A protein has these predicted regions:
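Non-heme di-metal
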Residues: 1-190
Length: 190
């Protein structure tokens, strides 16, 4: 079945462009977070940027080449504070998983492109998790809970690996002397 000239082709192009732009926005947002002293949030923006690159690649690989013309709207945002950037990122992820990709999946299904429909649905699941993470990080920033928790916790220095136990991080790491911005909650995920 030929993809060329279908609505699915246009949707794949729009999704490819959207994911590519999100990737770039997230790298810009990472720089802003780093400047504000949020090393972990910067790393999460970069990790998510890499995820978006892979989503874009998945959509791109379905395309059959040549030129295609379509009309689409994209966010003409700006680089704000970390809180503003987290909010904008969460809104973009929400738009993808709740509206765009389900609609694109339905059209692909109708047109007989079952593998494309499945890709849109699977990627939507990832975008849900991206939104959740951004909203939780936004809540932490807004409530001053990035480097301080209500209960004692184990923190790790992202630079040297030092573990600190307590409700908040020290002003600087006693091992490597990096500022508190390098601490994050330690998660044993291995």
């Amino acid at each position: 079945m030929k993809l060329k000239g279908t609505r699915t082709e246009k949707n794949l192009l729009a999704a490819f462009a959207g994911e590519s732009q999100a990737r770039n926005r997230y790298t810009y947002f990472a720089s802003a977070a780093k400047k504000e002293g949020f090393e972990q949030i910067a790393a999460i923006f970069m990790e998510t940027a890499d995820n978006e690159k892979e989503h874009a690649k998945r959509f791109f690989k379905f395309l059959e080449g040549g030129m295609a013309e379509f009309t689409a709207s994209f966010p003409a945002g700006r680089i704000g504070t970390t809180a503003e950037n987290l909010k904008a990122a969460a809104e973009g992820e929400h738009e993808e998983w709740s509206k765009l990709y389900p609609g694109f999946a339905d059209i692909a299904q109708e047109e007989g492109f079952l593998d494309v429909a499945a890709a849109f649905r699977y990627i939507s699941k990832v975008e849900i998790e991206h939104e959740k993470r951004y909203l939780k990080l936004l809540e932490n920033v807004a409530n001053g809970r990035v480097f301080k928790k209500e209960k004692s916790a184990t923190w790790i220095c992202r630079n040297c690996g030092y573990h600190h136990e307590g409700p908040e991080v020290p002003e600087q790491c006693p091992t490597c002397l990096h500022p508190k911005s390098f601490f994050e909650l330690w998660a044993e995920n291995y």
